Swiss-Prot record:
Name of this protein: Mitoguardin 1
Keyword Iron-sulfur: no
Gene: MIGA1
Superkingdom field: Eukaryota
Primary location group: mitochondrion
Listed InterPro entries: Miga (IPR019392)
Family: Belongs to the mitoguardin family.
Role description: Regulator of mitochondrial fusion: acts by forming homo- and heterodimers at the mitochondrial outer membrane and facilitating the formation of PLD6/MitoPLD dimers. May act by regulating phospholipid metabolism via PLD6/MitoPLD.
Keyword S-adenosyl-L-methionine: no
Residues with the Phosphoserine modification: 289, 293
Compartments (UniProt record): Mitochondrion outer membrane
GO cellular component: mitochondrial outer membrane; mitochondrion; plasma membrane
Subunit structure: Homodimer and heterodimer; forms heterodimers with MIGA2. Interacts with PLD6/MitoPLD.
Keyword line: Membrane, Mitochondrion, Mitochondrion outer membrane, Phosphoprotein, Transmembrane, Transmembrane helix
Length: 632
């Protein structure tokens, strides 16, 4: 039996049951230990599963009886390792993706700001306009939607004066980008830190500080314009009966009529007009040139002022002001200095005389033959009509004094006579008919017929502005800007000499006046005297504006510019006071005297230049004659 049960090559010790081979005993012991280890590991896994998943006790006994095959064990291990690897890779890619998000992409707004800032910093000769462009270009990608809502939702009545929403947003985007970059500086690499430094360089330059100030000023203008146009928008949208003003957590609801009163609108219009003037001065002083050259401009202005105070003002200095541009600019500088110290913001905002006129305009009681709103830079037709009503009453106060009437008549005679003399004509006949016209207007018996004649032409107010400035001067300037085709053909014909062209222009003017004389209803009325004056002055003005660019042309242009500037001044809150009739009349008279003095000074300088040229030519002829006599 022992032979059957024993394996070949193995002998058993009697009574012990141990194999005779010692190495086999060691292998059996190791196998037993490995089985115990596997069972213990299975037990520990089962215990961990029970603890983690909180399984019932019955599940424990069922789990203890489950046995996995080696293939299942391998699949379980591979699945666990794969799951852990996938989780690790997902976490790794998520961190990498977050880092990429922190960096600025080339098409993102911040990168646009940095690129344009680098370009502005690298260009040494960049001017004020280029820096403005660099700042505003960043808006197109950062504040596109916000600016569109702001611009289109609020209406654009005053959009021609400022487009400040985009410009301000561009400056804010630069500042916000700079602050955010500094706050997250730990997540930026070295190249990005260099970009942040480049952003800070141009913002702190005087040029860009000036631009930022202008952007904020334009933003204030835009807000005031929105406030002024709010009533029009509210009328279009009647559903919005009230507005909400947020102040922290509190919301106040007030009626629109209580917030935007008529007095507030008038004060806001005055403030806006002052702001527009200030904006134009900024652009004229610094906008078209480099701000670094402002000191040079100030030095030049100082030199002009110092030259004006020198007592020994020789012939050469006198002749230097004969040109229209230099003389007008110097006069405007002096005038601006005087006005700057005369009026304050309080006087501009408090204009009861103007407010009363605005009430009359709202009631439809003010009439004007021609609305010159845009030409005189008024805020609207209502603003123009209200100021016109005040100006009419002020001129009545001025003309009520005989000294003022004499001054206006003498000034008109001198200026128009100088134009005729400049055209190489004799002003004697003109002065005679001019005196007859003044005598006719002084007779009160003719005022009724004069009023009827002017009313037939649309002039319903016998006033210095309506008759002289608007009907006579401004209409004449407009007619000369668009002359008849026949006159244009004669003037533009290169085969005709200047004398023939001048005669043709004069003949055309006389033929037009002859036709108008035939249509007169009163043979010796206002228009009869007026056409008699036009027979002498109209050909001179027509040839002066349409003829060659000579000294007569310069004089006519200077005369026209002074009239236009005077009209703009009297419709400007900065130059005149609309607080009362007396103050407005005083300011109008001062402006009349100033413009008249400028014209007279120009005429004297031109006459002096003409005299000096004649003397120089005469001296040259005399010296040539003496030289010839010596040679003989």
């Amino acid at each position: 039996m022992s032979d059957c049960c024993s394996a070949p090559g193995i002998s058993w010790e009697a009574g012990v049951g141990r194999p005779a081979v010692p190495g086999l005993e060691l292998q059996i012991r190791r196998g037993a230990m490995s089985e115990e280890t596997v069972s213990e590991s299975q037990f520990s896994l089962k215990t961990a599963a029970l603890r983690v998943f909180d399984l019932p006790l019955t599940w424990y006994y069922s789990l203890s009886q489950i046995k996995f095959s080696p293939v299942a064990k391998k699949l379980f291990v591979v699945t666990a390792v794969s799951a852990i690897s996938v989780i690790f890779l997902a976490h790794h890619f998520k961190r990498k993706r977050g880092k990429k998000k922190g960096k600025i992409l080339p098409w993102e707004p911040e990168h646009l700001i940095l690129e344009y800032t680098k370009r502005a910093a690298s260009d040494k000769g960049s001017s004020c306009s280029s820096s403005r462009q660099n700042l505003t270009l960043s808006l197109s990608s950062t504040k596109d939607k916000g600016s569109q809502v702001c611009n289109y939702a609020n209406g654009g009545l005053f959009s021609k004066y400022s487009g400040s929403a985009q410009s301000l947003a561009s400056v804010q985007s630069v500042n916000s980008c700079h602050s955010c970059a500094c706050g997250n500086s730990n997540s930026w690499d070295k190249a990005d830190e260099d970009d942040i430094k480049l952003v800070n360089i141009p913002v702190t330059t005087p040029e860009n500080l000036y631009l930022m100030g202008m952007e904020l000023f334009e933003e204030a203008l835009r807000r005031w314009e929105q406030a002024l146009t709010f009533r029009n928008r509210q009328a279009e949208d009647e559903a919005c009966g009230s507005i909400k003003l947020g102040a922290g957590d509190a919301i106040a609801e007030e009626n629109v009529d209580d917030i935007i009163s008529t007095e507030f609108i008038h004060k806001l219009e005055a403030l806006l007009q002052r702001a527009y003037r200030l904006q134009e001065e900024f652009e004229a002083t610094l906008g078209a040139s480099d701000p670094n050259s402002l000191a040079d401009d100030i030095d030049k202005d100082t030199d002009i002022t110092m030259k004006g105070n020198v007592e020994d003002f020789g012939l050469r200095d006198t002749l230097s002001i004969a040109s229209t541009d230099s003389f007008a600019s110097a006069a405007e500088l002096a005038e601006h200095r005087e006005v700057r110290h005369t009026y304050s913001l309080e006087s501009l905002c408090h204009c009861p005389f103007y407010e009363e006129a605005m009430h009359l305009v709202e009631e439809g009681k003010i009439y004007s033959r021609v609305l010159r709103t845009e030409m005189l830079e008024c805020l609207g037709d209502s603003d123009f009509l209200a100021k016109l009503h005040c100006i009419r009453q002020a001129f009545q106060v001025i003309l009520s004094e005989s000294a003022n009437r004499i001054f206006l008549a003498e000034s008109g005679r001198k200026i128009l006579s100088a134009l005729i003399v400049k055209a190489r004509k004799n002003p004697k006949k003109f002065e005679d008919v001019f005196d007859e016209m003044i005598y006719f207007l002084e007779q009160t018996d003719h005022w009724g017929s004069t009023e009827m004649e002017l009313a037939a032409r649309g002039v319903k107010n016998l006033n210095f502005y309506d008759v002289v400035l608007d009907f006579i001067l401004m209409d004449s300037f407009e007619d000369l800007e668009n002359p008849p085709t026949s006159i244009q053909n004669v003037v533009n014909n290169r085969w005709l000499n200047s004398s023939f062209k001048e005669t043709a222009v004069a003949s055309s003017c006389w033929s037009v006046l002859k036709q108008k004389r035939q249509q007169m209803k009163i043979p010796d009325g206002f228009f009869a005297h007026f056409y008699a004056i036009c027979e002498h002055i109209s050909p001179v003005l027509a040839w002066g504006f349409l003829g060659p660019r000579n000294s007569l042309y310069d004089l006519c242009c200077f005369f026209k510019n002074q009239v236009l500037l005077f009209l703009k001044d009297i419709f400007d809150f900065e130059k005149v006071r609309y607080s009362s009739t007396e103050t407005l009349a005083e300011d109008l008279m001062q402006l009349l005297i100033r413009r008249t003095e400028l014209l007279m000074a120009y005429l004297e300088a031109d006459a002096l230049r003409h005299t000096s040229s004649c003397l120089s030519s005469h001296g040259h002829v005399m010296s040539t004659g003496l030289l010839e006599a010596k040679v003989q």
